[in-house]
Amino acid sequence: MSNQHIEELNDQQIVRREKMMALAEQGIDPFGKRFGRTANSAELKENYADKTKEELHELNETAIVAGRLMTKRGKGKVGFAHLQDREGQIQLYVRKDSVGEDNYEIFKKADLGDFIGVEGEVMRTDMGELSIKATKLTHLSKSLRPLPEKFHGLTDIETIYRKRHLDLISNRESFDRFVTRSKMISEIRRYLDGLDFLEVETPVLHNEAGGAAARPFVTHHNAQNIDMVLRIATELHLKRLIVGGMERVYEIGRIFRNEGMDATHNPEFTSIEVYQAYADYLDIMNLTEGIIQHAAKAVKGDGPIDYQGTEIRINEPFKRVHMVDAIKEVTGVDFWPEMTVEEAIALAKEKQVPLEKHFTSVGHIINAFFEEFVEETLVQPTFVFGHPVEVSPLAKKNPEDTRFTDRFELFIMTKEYANAFTELNDPIDQLSRFEAQAQAKELGDDEATGIDYDFVEALEYGMPPTGGLGIGIDRLCMLLTNTTTIRDVLLFPTMKP
Protein backbone atom coordinates (compact mmCIF):
# COMPACT_ATOMS: atom_id res chain seq x y z
CA MET A 1 0.00 0.00 0.00
CA SER A 2 1.59 3.26 -1.12
CA ASN A 3 2.09 6.26 1.15
CA GLN A 4 0.24 8.34 -1.41
CA HIS A 5 -2.84 6.13 -1.03
CA ILE A 6 -2.66 6.30 2.78
CA GLU A 7 -2.47 10.11 2.62
CA GLU A 8 -5.74 10.13 0.65
CA LEU A 9 -7.56 8.23 3.38
CA ASN A 10 -9.46 9.85 6.22
CA ASP A 11 -8.67 9.10 9.86
CA GLN A 12 -11.27 6.34 10.19
CA GLN A 13 -10.05 4.55 7.08
CA ILE A 14 -6.44 4.70 8.29
CA VAL A 15 -7.40 3.22 11.67
CA ARG A 16 -9.33 0.41 10.00
CA ARG A 17 -6.35 -0.46 7.80
CA GLU A 18 -4.10 -0.50 10.84
CA LYS A 19 -6.52 -2.96 12.47
CA MET A 20 -6.46 -5.04 9.31
CA MET A 21 -2.67 -5.26 9.46
CA ALA A 22 -2.79 -6.06 13.18
CA LEU A 23 -5.09 -9.01 12.46
CA ALA A 24 -2.67 -10.30 9.85
CA GLU A 25 0.21 -10.01 12.31
CA GLN A 26 -1.78 -12.19 14.75
CA GLY A 27 -2.15 -14.85 12.06
CA ILE A 28 -5.82 -13.99 11.41
CA ASP A 29 -6.78 -13.57 7.75
CA PRO A 30 -8.47 -10.11 7.60
CA PHE A 31 -10.77 -11.38 4.85
CA GLY A 32 -11.51 -14.79 6.29
CA LYS A 33 -12.57 -18.11 4.85
CA ARG A 34 -15.57 -20.42 4.69
CA PHE A 35 -17.71 -20.39 7.83
CA GLY A 36 -20.45 -22.89 8.60
CA ARG A 37 -23.47 -21.51 10.39
CA THR A 38 -26.42 -23.43 11.79
CA ALA A 39 -29.11 -20.75 11.74
CA ASN A 40 -29.97 -17.25 10.59
CA SER A 41 -31.65 -14.51 12.60
CA ALA A 42 -35.17 -15.26 11.36
CA GLU A 43 -34.90 -18.99 12.08
CA LEU A 44 -33.74 -18.29 15.63
CA LYS A 45 -36.61 -15.89 16.27
CA GLU A 46 -39.12 -18.32 14.81
CA ASN A 47 -37.78 -21.36 16.66
CA TYR A 48 -37.61 -19.67 20.06
CA ALA A 49 -40.40 -17.09 19.81
CA ASP A 50 -42.47 -18.68 22.59
CA LYS A 51 -39.59 -19.51 24.93
CA THR A 52 -39.05 -17.52 28.12
CA LYS A 53 -35.66 -16.62 29.56
CA GLU A 54 -35.93 -19.47 32.06
CA GLU A 55 -37.01 -22.03 29.45
CA LEU A 56 -34.09 -21.12 27.19
CA HIS A 57 -31.68 -21.44 30.11
CA GLU A 58 -33.12 -24.89 30.81
CA LEU A 59 -32.84 -25.93 27.15
CA ASN A 60 -29.20 -24.83 26.94
CA GLU A 61 -29.24 -24.93 23.12
CA THR A 62 -26.44 -23.53 20.98
CA ALA A 63 -26.35 -21.89 17.57
CA ILE A 64 -23.72 -20.65 15.14
CA VAL A 65 -24.53 -17.40 13.34
CA ALA A 66 -22.67 -15.03 11.03
CA GLY A 67 -23.23 -11.55 9.69
CA ARG A 68 -22.26 -7.90 9.63
CA LEU A 69 -21.65 -6.06 12.91
CA MET A 70 -24.18 -3.21 13.00
CA THR A 71 -24.07 -2.01 16.61
CA LYS A 72 -21.66 -2.48 19.49
CA ARG A 73 -21.77 -1.16 23.04
CA GLY A 74 -20.39 -1.92 26.46
CA LYS A 75 -17.06 -1.60 28.19
CA GLY A 76 -14.82 -3.57 30.47
CA LYS A 77 -15.47 -7.27 30.33
CA VAL A 78 -19.03 -7.30 28.90
CA GLY A 79 -20.40 -6.14 25.56
CA PHE A 80 -23.55 -6.23 23.45
CA ALA A 81 -23.80 -6.07 19.67
CA HIS A 82 -26.22 -6.67 16.80
CA LEU A 83 -25.31 -8.93 13.93
CA GLN A 84 -27.14 -8.47 10.62
CA ASP A 85 -27.73 -11.22 8.06
CA ARG A 86 -30.09 -11.47 5.10
CA GLU A 87 -33.12 -12.06 7.28
CA GLY A 88 -32.58 -9.34 9.89
CA GLN A 89 -30.62 -8.85 13.11
CA ILE A 90 -29.81 -10.88 16.22
CA GLN A 91 -28.32 -9.52 19.43
CA LEU A 92 -24.98 -10.80 20.75
CA TYR A 93 -24.05 -10.93 24.43
CA VAL A 94 -20.27 -11.19 24.79
CA ARG A 95 -18.47 -11.78 28.10
CA LYS A 96 -14.71 -11.95 28.42
CA ASP A 97 -14.94 -14.88 30.84
CA SER A 98 -17.05 -16.83 28.30
CA VAL A 99 -15.02 -16.30 25.14
CA GLY A 100 -11.52 -15.91 26.56
CA GLU A 101 -9.11 -13.00 26.43
CA ASP A 102 -7.96 -13.42 22.80
CA ASN A 103 -11.50 -13.80 21.51
CA TYR A 104 -12.67 -10.82 23.50
CA GLU A 105 -9.91 -8.71 21.93
CA ILE A 106 -11.32 -9.58 18.51
CA PHE A 107 -14.71 -8.32 19.68
CA LYS A 108 -13.30 -5.15 21.25
CA LYS A 109 -11.32 -4.23 18.13
CA ALA A 110 -14.07 -5.10 15.66
CA ASP A 111 -15.49 -2.13 13.75
CA LEU A 112 -19.07 -1.62 12.68
CA GLY A 113 -19.37 -3.17 9.25
CA ASP A 114 -17.00 -6.06 9.97
CA PHE A 115 -18.26 -9.59 9.37
CA ILE A 116 -17.94 -11.99 12.28
CA GLY A 117 -19.08 -15.51 13.10
CA VAL A 118 -20.40 -16.34 16.55
CA GLU A 119 -21.01 -19.61 18.34
CA GLY A 120 -22.95 -19.53 21.56
CA GLU A 121 -25.96 -20.27 23.73
CA VAL A 122 -29.43 -19.11 22.73
CA MET A 123 -30.76 -16.92 25.55
CA ARG A 124 -33.11 -14.10 26.37
CA THR A 125 -31.97 -10.95 28.18
CA ASP A 126 -33.70 -9.37 31.17
CA MET A 127 -35.27 -6.96 28.65
CA GLY A 128 -36.72 -9.95 26.79
CA GLU A 129 -34.58 -9.74 23.65
CA LEU A 130 -33.54 -13.03 22.06
CA SER A 131 -29.74 -13.15 21.97
CA ILE A 132 -26.70 -15.35 21.49
CA LYS A 133 -24.41 -15.58 24.51
CA ALA A 134 -21.09 -15.97 22.72
CA THR A 135 -18.65 -18.76 23.55
CA LYS A 136 -16.50 -18.25 20.43
CA LEU A 137 -16.03 -15.42 17.94
CA THR A 138 -14.44 -15.72 14.50
CA HIS A 139 -13.32 -12.74 12.44
CA LEU A 140 -14.60 -13.22 8.88
CA SER A 141 -14.00 -10.01 6.91
CA LYS A 142 -12.70 -6.51 7.62
CA SER A 143 -14.68 -3.44 6.58
CA LEU A 144 -12.17 -0.79 5.51
CA ARG A 145 -14.76 1.98 5.21
CA PRO A 146 -17.22 3.14 7.87
CA LEU A 147 -20.90 2.48 7.21
CA PRO A 148 -23.43 5.29 6.71
CA GLU A 149 -24.63 6.96 9.91
CA LYS A 150 -26.22 4.12 11.84
CA PHE A 151 -29.24 5.73 13.48
CA HIS A 152 -30.93 7.20 10.42
CA GLY A 153 -29.80 4.89 7.67
CA LEU A 154 -28.83 6.12 4.22
CA THR A 155 -30.99 9.09 3.20
CA ASP A 156 -29.11 10.78 0.33
CA ILE A 157 -31.06 9.82 -2.81
CA GLU A 158 -28.08 10.08 -5.15
CA THR A 159 -26.02 7.75 -2.94
CA ILE A 160 -28.92 5.30 -2.59
CA TYR A 161 -29.07 4.80 -6.37
CA ARG A 162 -25.34 4.93 -7.08
CA LYS A 163 -24.28 2.76 -4.15
CA ARG A 164 -27.12 0.30 -3.74
CA HIS A 165 -24.91 -1.93 -1.56
CA LEU A 166 -24.93 0.79 1.12
CA ASP A 167 -28.67 1.25 0.75
CA LEU A 168 -29.24 -2.49 1.27
CA ILE A 169 -27.04 -2.49 4.38
CA SER A 170 -28.66 0.57 5.91
CA ASN A 171 -32.32 0.49 4.86
CA ARG A 172 -34.26 -2.64 5.71
CA GLU A 173 -37.32 -1.34 3.85
CA SER A 174 -35.28 -1.09 0.66
CA PHE A 175 -33.78 -4.56 1.20
CA ASP A 176 -37.23 -6.08 1.69
CA ARG A 177 -38.53 -4.34 -1.44
CA PHE A 178 -35.99 -6.17 -3.59
CA VAL A 179 -36.74 -9.46 -1.85
CA THR A 180 -40.39 -8.84 -2.78
CA ARG A 181 -39.37 -8.21 -6.39
CA SER A 182 -37.57 -11.56 -6.55
CA LYS A 183 -40.51 -13.34 -4.96
CA MET A 184 -42.94 -11.69 -7.40
CA ILE A 185 -40.94 -12.82 -10.44
CA SER A 186 -40.59 -16.34 -9.02
CA GLU A 187 -44.36 -16.55 -8.49
CA ILE A 188 -45.05 -15.39 -12.06
CA ARG A 189 -42.75 -18.15 -13.30
CA ARG A 190 -44.45 -20.68 -11.04
CA TYR A 191 -47.89 -19.64 -12.31
CA LEU A 192 -46.94 -19.92 -15.99
CA ASP A 193 -44.97 -23.14 -15.51
CA GLY A 194 -48.08 -24.59 -13.88
CA LEU A 195 -50.01 -23.77 -17.07
CA ASP A 196 -47.45 -25.70 -19.15
CA PHE A 197 -45.63 -22.68 -20.59
CA LEU A 198 -41.95 -23.03 -21.52
CA GLU A 199 -39.48 -20.36 -20.42
CA VAL A 200 -37.09 -19.56 -23.28
CA GLU A 201 -34.25 -17.16 -24.10
CA THR A 202 -33.95 -15.09 -27.28
CA PRO A 203 -31.21 -12.75 -28.57
CA VAL A 204 -30.55 -9.35 -27.05
CA LEU A 205 -28.66 -8.16 -30.16
CA HIS A 206 -30.93 -7.70 -33.19
CA ASN A 207 -30.28 -6.72 -36.80
CA GLU A 208 -33.50 -4.71 -36.92
CA ALA A 209 -35.52 -3.16 -34.08
CA GLY A 210 -38.99 -4.62 -33.93
CA GLY A 211 -41.86 -5.81 -31.78
CA ALA A 212 -42.59 -2.38 -30.28
CA ALA A 213 -42.71 1.32 -31.09
CA ALA A 214 -39.52 2.66 -29.53
CA ARG A 215 -36.14 4.17 -30.38
CA PRO A 216 -33.36 1.56 -30.04
CA PHE A 217 -29.80 1.71 -28.79
CA VAL A 218 -27.43 1.16 -31.72
CA THR A 219 -24.15 -0.71 -31.36
CA HIS A 220 -21.55 -2.16 -33.72
CA HIS A 221 -20.40 -5.76 -34.15
CA ASN A 222 -16.70 -5.50 -34.95
CA ALA A 223 -16.13 -9.04 -36.23
CA GLN A 224 -18.98 -8.84 -38.75
CA ASN A 225 -18.61 -5.08 -39.29
CA ILE A 226 -22.34 -4.46 -38.99
CA ASP A 227 -24.48 -2.15 -36.90
CA MET A 228 -26.88 -3.91 -34.54
CA VAL A 229 -29.50 -2.78 -32.04
CA LEU A 230 -30.28 -3.85 -28.50
CA ARG A 231 -33.73 -5.39 -28.43
CA ILE A 232 -36.73 -3.16 -27.79
CA ALA A 233 -38.95 -6.24 -27.36
CA THR A 234 -38.72 -10.03 -27.45
CA GLU A 235 -41.87 -10.42 -29.52
CA LEU A 236 -40.70 -11.33 -33.00
CA HIS A 237 -38.31 -14.08 -31.92
CA LEU A 238 -40.87 -15.58 -29.54
CA LYS A 239 -43.45 -15.74 -32.32
CA ARG A 240 -40.95 -17.62 -34.47
CA LEU A 241 -40.93 -20.23 -31.70
CA ILE A 242 -44.71 -20.48 -32.04
CA VAL A 243 -44.15 -21.04 -35.78
CA GLY A 244 -41.69 -23.76 -34.75
CA GLY A 245 -44.36 -25.57 -32.73
CA MET A 246 -43.52 -24.67 -29.12
CA GLU A 247 -47.15 -23.50 -28.61
CA ARG A 248 -46.75 -21.91 -25.14
CA VAL A 249 -43.65 -19.81 -24.42
CA TYR A 250 -42.58 -16.92 -22.24
CA GLU A 251 -39.44 -14.90 -21.63
CA ILE A 252 -38.55 -12.66 -18.70
CA GLY A 253 -35.69 -10.44 -19.75
CA ARG A 254 -34.07 -7.06 -20.17
CA ILE A 255 -35.39 -4.62 -22.77
CA PHE A 256 -33.53 -1.51 -23.94
CA ARG A 257 -35.16 1.67 -25.25
CA ASN A 258 -33.18 4.82 -26.03
CA GLU A 259 -35.78 7.21 -24.69
CA GLY A 260 -36.47 9.60 -21.84
CA MET A 261 -36.26 8.81 -18.15
CA ASP A 262 -38.94 9.62 -15.59
CA ALA A 263 -40.66 8.09 -12.58
CA THR A 264 -41.87 5.08 -14.58
CA HIS A 265 -39.28 4.81 -17.37
CA ASN A 266 -35.67 3.61 -17.36
CA PRO A 267 -33.72 2.93 -20.58
CA GLU A 268 -33.04 -0.62 -19.37
CA PHE A 269 -35.99 -2.48 -17.87
CA THR A 270 -37.50 -5.93 -17.42
CA SER A 271 -40.53 -7.28 -19.20
CA ILE A 272 -42.26 -10.59 -19.58
CA GLU A 273 -43.74 -11.61 -22.91
CA VAL A 274 -46.05 -14.62 -23.19
CA TYR A 275 -47.39 -16.34 -26.32
CA GLN A 276 -50.06 -19.03 -26.50
CA ALA A 277 -51.04 -20.87 -29.67
CA TYR A 278 -54.72 -21.44 -30.48
CA ALA A 279 -55.72 -18.52 -28.21
CA ASP A 280 -57.03 -15.01 -28.83
CA TYR A 281 -56.87 -11.72 -26.97
CA LEU A 282 -59.80 -12.67 -24.72
CA ASP A 283 -57.96 -15.79 -23.54
CA ILE A 284 -54.88 -13.64 -22.93
CA MET A 285 -57.00 -11.12 -21.03
CA ASN A 286 -57.96 -13.89 -18.62
CA LEU A 287 -54.32 -15.04 -18.44
CA THR A 288 -53.13 -11.50 -17.67
CA GLU A 289 -55.65 -11.10 -14.87
CA GLY A 290 -54.52 -14.45 -13.46
CA ILE A 291 -50.81 -13.58 -13.59
CA ILE A 292 -51.24 -10.24 -11.84
CA GLN A 293 -53.70 -11.47 -9.22
CA HIS A 294 -51.47 -14.47 -8.47
CA ALA A 295 -48.40 -12.25 -8.08
CA ALA A 296 -50.30 -9.79 -5.88
CA LYS A 297 -51.67 -12.53 -3.64
CA ALA A 298 -48.22 -14.11 -3.27
CA VAL A 299 -46.55 -10.92 -2.04
CA LYS A 300 -49.46 -8.96 -0.51
CA GLY A 301 -51.99 -11.59 0.53
CA ASP A 302 -55.71 -11.70 -0.25
CA GLY A 303 -57.80 -8.59 -0.70
CA PRO A 304 -57.22 -5.15 -2.20
CA ILE A 305 -53.85 -3.40 -2.01
CA ASP A 306 -52.97 0.14 -1.01
CA TYR A 307 -51.05 2.28 -3.46
CA GLN A 308 -50.11 5.75 -2.22
CA GLY A 309 -53.33 6.04 -0.23
CA THR A 310 -55.63 4.64 -2.95
CA GLU A 311 -57.27 1.25 -2.48
CA ILE A 312 -56.72 -0.84 -5.61
CA ARG A 313 -59.25 -3.67 -5.94
CA ILE A 314 -56.73 -5.94 -7.60
CA ASN A 315 -58.44 -9.04 -6.18
CA GLU A 316 -61.71 -8.37 -8.04
CA PRO A 317 -62.49 -8.97 -11.75
CA PHE A 318 -60.89 -6.24 -13.88
CA LYS A 319 -63.12 -3.82 -15.80
CA ARG A 320 -63.22 -4.29 -19.60
CA VAL A 321 -64.07 -1.45 -22.03
CA HIS A 322 -63.61 -0.73 -25.75
CA MET A 323 -61.36 2.26 -26.47
CA VAL A 324 -64.07 4.06 -28.46
CA ASP A 325 -66.61 3.59 -25.63
CA ALA A 326 -64.07 4.84 -23.09
CA ILE A 327 -63.45 8.00 -25.16
CA LYS A 328 -67.18 8.60 -25.55
CA GLU A 329 -67.74 8.11 -21.82
CA VAL A 330 -65.09 10.69 -20.88
CA THR A 331 -65.37 13.28 -23.70
CA GLY A 332 -68.75 12.72 -25.34
CA VAL A 333 -67.01 12.33 -28.71
CA ASP A 334 -68.25 9.27 -30.63
CA PHE A 335 -65.84 7.61 -33.06
CA TRP A 336 -68.09 4.65 -33.86
CA PRO A 337 -69.60 6.26 -37.00
CA GLU A 338 -67.16 6.13 -39.90
CA MET A 339 -65.61 9.51 -40.75
CA THR A 340 -62.87 11.04 -42.86
CA VAL A 341 -59.48 11.92 -41.43
CA GLU A 342 -60.34 15.60 -41.99
CA GLU A 343 -63.44 15.23 -39.80
CA ALA A 344 -61.38 13.50 -37.12
CA ILE A 345 -58.73 16.25 -37.21
CA ALA A 346 -61.49 18.85 -36.84
CA LEU A 347 -62.73 17.05 -33.70
CA ALA A 348 -59.18 16.97 -32.37
CA LYS A 349 -58.72 20.70 -32.93
CA GLU A 350 -62.07 21.39 -31.28
CA LYS A 351 -60.95 19.45 -28.19
CA GLN A 352 -57.39 20.88 -28.40
CA VAL A 353 -55.78 17.48 -28.85
CA PRO A 354 -52.10 17.85 -29.88
CA LEU A 355 -51.55 16.67 -33.46
CA GLU A 356 -48.38 15.11 -34.90
CA LYS A 357 -47.18 15.14 -38.51
CA HIS A 358 -47.59 11.37 -38.84
CA PHE A 359 -51.27 11.44 -37.77
CA THR A 360 -52.53 10.47 -41.23
CA SER A 361 -55.64 8.47 -40.29
CA VAL A 362 -58.70 8.46 -38.06
CA GLY A 363 -57.05 5.70 -36.02
CA HIS A 364 -54.19 7.98 -35.04
CA ILE A 365 -56.68 10.61 -33.86
CA ILE A 366 -58.66 8.05 -31.83
CA ASN A 367 -55.48 6.94 -30.09
CA ALA A 368 -54.51 10.58 -29.41
CA PHE A 369 -57.94 11.24 -27.83
CA PHE A 370 -57.51 8.20 -25.60
CA GLU A 371 -54.05 9.25 -24.42
CA GLU A 372 -55.12 12.86 -23.87
CA PHE A 373 -58.38 12.32 -21.99
CA VAL A 374 -58.95 8.72 -20.90
CA GLU A 375 -55.68 7.35 -19.51
CA GLU A 376 -55.71 9.72 -16.53
CA THR A 377 -59.14 8.41 -15.46
CA LEU A 378 -58.17 4.71 -15.30
CA VAL A 379 -57.39 4.14 -11.62
CA GLN A 380 -58.85 0.70 -10.91
CA PRO A 381 -57.57 -2.24 -13.02
CA THR A 382 -59.10 -1.77 -16.48
CA PHE A 383 -58.64 -3.64 -19.75
CA VAL A 384 -59.01 -1.22 -22.67
CA PHE A 385 -59.44 -3.13 -25.94
CA GLY A 386 -60.09 -2.37 -29.60
CA HIS A 387 -57.08 -0.22 -30.52
CA PRO A 388 -57.00 1.25 -34.05
CA VAL A 389 -55.10 -0.81 -36.61
CA GLU A 390 -52.76 2.11 -37.37
CA VAL A 391 -51.18 1.98 -33.90
CA SER A 392 -51.17 -1.82 -33.67
CA PRO A 393 -48.88 -3.10 -36.45
CA LEU A 394 -48.59 -6.62 -35.01
CA ALA A 395 -52.19 -7.20 -33.92
CA LYS A 396 -54.95 -8.99 -35.82
CA LYS A 397 -57.84 -6.91 -37.14
CA ASN A 398 -61.20 -7.36 -35.47
CA PRO A 399 -63.31 -9.41 -37.91
CA GLU A 400 -66.48 -7.43 -37.12
CA ASP A 401 -64.89 -3.97 -37.54
CA THR A 402 -61.57 -3.99 -39.37
CA ARG A 403 -60.76 -0.40 -38.32
CA PHE A 404 -59.85 -1.86 -34.95
CA THR A 405 -57.71 -4.72 -33.67
CA ASP A 406 -58.17 -7.52 -31.17
CA ARG A 407 -55.77 -5.82 -28.78
CA PHE A 408 -55.93 -4.65 -25.18
CA GLU A 409 -53.88 -2.70 -22.68
CA LEU A 410 -54.22 -3.02 -18.92
CA PHE A 411 -54.26 0.25 -16.98
CA ILE A 412 -53.93 0.64 -13.21
CA MET A 413 -53.47 3.99 -11.44
CA THR A 414 -53.52 5.69 -14.90
CA LYS A 415 -50.44 3.72 -16.07
CA GLU A 416 -50.14 0.94 -18.63
CA TYR A 417 -49.17 -2.41 -17.10
CA ALA A 418 -49.76 -4.82 -19.97
CA ASN A 419 -50.16 -4.83 -23.74
CA ALA A 420 -51.61 -7.81 -25.58
CA PHE A 421 -53.43 -8.92 -28.68
CA THR A 422 -54.50 -11.65 -31.00
CA GLU A 423 -51.31 -11.90 -33.01
CA LEU A 424 -51.26 -11.07 -36.69
CA ASN A 425 -50.39 -14.31 -38.48
CA ASP A 426 -51.14 -13.24 -42.07
CA PRO A 427 -47.70 -12.60 -43.64
CA ILE A 428 -49.12 -10.47 -46.48
CA ASP A 429 -50.99 -8.20 -44.06
CA GLN A 430 -47.93 -8.13 -41.79
CA LEU A 431 -45.66 -6.95 -44.61
CA SER A 432 -48.06 -4.17 -45.58
CA ARG A 433 -48.19 -2.97 -41.96
CA PHE A 434 -44.41 -3.04 -41.71
CA GLU A 435 -44.33 -0.91 -44.88
CA ALA A 436 -46.76 1.57 -43.31
CA GLN A 437 -44.51 1.74 -40.24
CA ALA A 438 -41.48 2.36 -42.45
CA GLN A 439 -43.35 5.22 -44.13
CA ALA A 440 -44.24 6.71 -40.74
CA LYS A 441 -40.56 6.49 -39.83
CA GLU A 442 -39.69 8.52 -42.93
CA LEU A 443 -42.26 11.13 -41.87
CA GLY A 444 -40.45 11.62 -38.57
CA ASP A 445 -41.96 9.02 -36.22
CA ASP A 446 -38.85 7.97 -34.27
CA GLU A 447 -40.74 5.12 -32.63
CA ALA A 448 -41.91 3.49 -35.85
CA THR A 449 -40.18 0.24 -36.77
CA GLY A 450 -38.51 -0.89 -39.98
CA ILE A 451 -39.32 -4.00 -41.99
CA ASP A 452 -38.22 -7.35 -40.59
CA TYR A 453 -38.22 -9.53 -43.70
CA ASP A 454 -36.94 -12.57 -41.78
CA PHE A 455 -39.99 -12.45 -39.54
CA VAL A 456 -42.33 -12.10 -42.52
CA GLU A 457 -40.65 -15.14 -44.08
CA ALA A 458 -41.18 -17.11 -40.86
CA LEU A 459 -44.89 -16.26 -40.93
CA GLU A 460 -45.08 -17.55 -44.50
CA TYR A 461 -44.40 -21.05 -43.14
CA GLY A 462 -47.59 -20.72 -41.11
CA MET A 463 -48.27 -19.60 -37.55
CA PRO A 464 -51.35 -20.89 -35.72
CA PRO A 465 -53.86 -18.41 -34.28
CA THR A 466 -51.99 -17.02 -31.27
CA GLY A 467 -52.49 -14.67 -28.36
CA GLY A 468 -49.56 -12.66 -27.02
CA LEU A 469 -48.87 -10.53 -23.96
CA GLY A 470 -46.27 -8.16 -22.56
CA ILE A 471 -46.15 -7.00 -18.92
CA GLY A 472 -43.75 -4.45 -17.44
CA ILE A 473 -42.18 -6.21 -14.47
CA ASP A 474 -40.77 -3.02 -12.95
CA ARG A 475 -44.10 -1.17 -12.94
CA LEU A 476 -45.85 -4.17 -11.46
CA CYS A 477 -43.21 -4.29 -8.75
CA MET A 478 -43.73 -0.56 -8.07
CA LEU A 479 -47.44 -1.22 -7.62
CA LEU A 480 -46.95 -4.18 -5.28
CA THR A 481 -44.28 -2.43 -3.18
CA ASN A 482 -46.12 0.93 -3.02
CA THR A 483 -43.27 2.92 -4.56
CA THR A 484 -43.53 5.95 -6.84
CA THR A 485 -40.32 5.78 -8.87
CA ILE A 486 -38.91 2.97 -10.98
CA ARG A 487 -35.46 3.62 -9.52
CA ASP A 488 -36.67 2.23 -6.20
CA VAL A 489 -37.36 -1.19 -7.76
CA LEU A 490 -34.22 -1.37 -9.92
CA LEU A 491 -31.16 -2.48 -8.01
CA PHE A 492 -28.91 -0.43 -10.27
CA PRO A 493 -30.88 2.23 -12.20
CA THR A 494 -29.28 4.11 -15.08
CA MET A 495 -27.29 7.10 -13.79
CA LYS A 496 -25.04 9.72 -15.33
CA PRO A 497 -21.35 8.96 -14.68
From Swiss-Prot:
GO BP annotations of the record are: lysyl-tRNA aminoacylation
Cofactor(s), names only, from the UniProt record: Mg(2+)
One Pfam entry name: tRNA_anti-codon
- Tell me which UniProt keywords the record has, alphabetically: Aminoacyl-tRNA synthetase, ATP-binding, Cytoplasm, Ligase, Magnesium, Metal-binding, Nucleotide-binding, Protein biosynthesis
Give the cofactor binding note. Answer: Binds 3 Mg(2+) ions per subunit.
Recorded hits in SUPFAM superfamilies, A to Z, give: Class II aaRS and biotin synthetases, Nucleic acid-binding proteins
The record's subcellular location field reads: Cytoplasm
Quote the EC number: 6.1.1.6
Question: What GO cellular-component annotations does this UniProt entry give?
Answer: cytosol
User: What InterPro entries does the database record attribute to this sequence?
Assistant: Aa-tRNA-synt_II (IPR004364), aa-tRNA-synth_II (IPR006195), aa-tRNA-synth_II/BPL/LPL (IPR045864), Lys-tRNA-ligase_II (IPR002313), Lys-tRNA-ligase_II_N (IPR044136), Lys-tRNA-synth_II_C (IPR018149), NA-bd_OB-fold (IPR012340), NA-bd_OB_tRNA (IPR004365)
| Ligand binding (Mg(2+) 1) | E409, E416
Residues annotated to bind Mg(2+) 2: E416
Q: What class of enzyme is it?
A: ligase
Gene Ontology terms, MF aspect = ATP binding; catalytic activity, acting on a protein; lysine-tRNA ligase activity; magnesium ion binding; transferase activity; tRNA binding
Q: Which HAMAP family match?
A: Lys_tRNA_synth_class2
Which PANTHER family does the entry mention?
Answer: LYSINE--TRNA LIGASE, CHLOROPLASTIC_MITOCHONDRIAL, LYSYL-TRNA SYNTHETASE
Protein name per UniProt = Lysine--tRNA ligase
Q: What organism, scientifically named, is this protein from? A: Streptococcus pyogenes serotype M3 (strain ATCC BAA-595 / MGAS315)
The opening ranks of the lineage are: Bacteria, Bacillati, Bacillota, Bacilli, Lactobacillales
Give me the gene this protein comes from. lysS
